[in-house]
């Protein structure tokens, strides 16, 4: 695929626009509060561990279409097959912060509606929202529709195993665990 499809363009726009919106909102809320807002801290956290994408891609042989613009060749962590897509670092903000915001809203609604305990509700909500988000984003949008592919998966722990569209289910679980933290931190109500 030598040119950007509408899906690839939408994915790249999601990365850049999502990052801009969340960082701008985090800066605004921090300014208004007079101290760092949890949303800005999530943005900083998300982009700070975007470095892991290259070694992760190398380990599972993640492959991106060649039409996606790449980081320059001198980029220190350019281990991804074909080079790391330039939209990955800002994309981490949009990819990780949006499900956290959804998890916080859903968790707070569940707490208010059913009078459930806040910490446990936020953690479980984060696990479920994060797992579903990763499945929809990585399995369906990514692997099934062709934004990227997984070259290797652990036998028996993948969907569509052995095909170009194979997806490791443990990827969804890992995202769920990450979202437990990302949902709890901004969702907690103690000061």
Locate predicted features.
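Aromatic-rich, lipid-facing transmembrane alpha helices and their immediate juxtamembrane interface loops
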Residues: 1-191
């Amino acid at each position: 695929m030598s040119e950007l499809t509408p899906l690839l363009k939408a994915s790249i726009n999601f990365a850049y626009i999502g990052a801009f919106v969340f960082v701008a909102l985090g800066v605004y809320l921090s300014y208004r509060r007079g101290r760092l807002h949890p949303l800005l801290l999530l943005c900083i956290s998300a982009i700070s561990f975007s470095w892991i994408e290259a070694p992760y891609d190398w380990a599972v042989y993640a492959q991106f279409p060649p039409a996606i613009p790449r980081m320059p060749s001198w980029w220190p962590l350019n281990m991804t097959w074909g080079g790391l897509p330039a939209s990955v670092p800002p994309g981490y903000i949009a990819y990780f912060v949006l499900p956290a915001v959804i998890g916080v809203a859903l968790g707070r609604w569940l707490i208010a509606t059913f009078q459930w305990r806040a910490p446990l509700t936020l953690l479980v909500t984060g696990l479920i929202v994060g797992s579903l988000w990763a499945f929809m984003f990585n399995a369906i949008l990514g692997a099934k529709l062709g934004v990227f592919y997984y070259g290797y998966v652990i036998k028996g722990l993948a969907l569509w195993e052995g095909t170009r569209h194979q997806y490791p289910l443990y990827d969804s679980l890992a995202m769920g665990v990450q979202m437990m933290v990302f949902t709890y931190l901004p969702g907690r109500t103690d000061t």
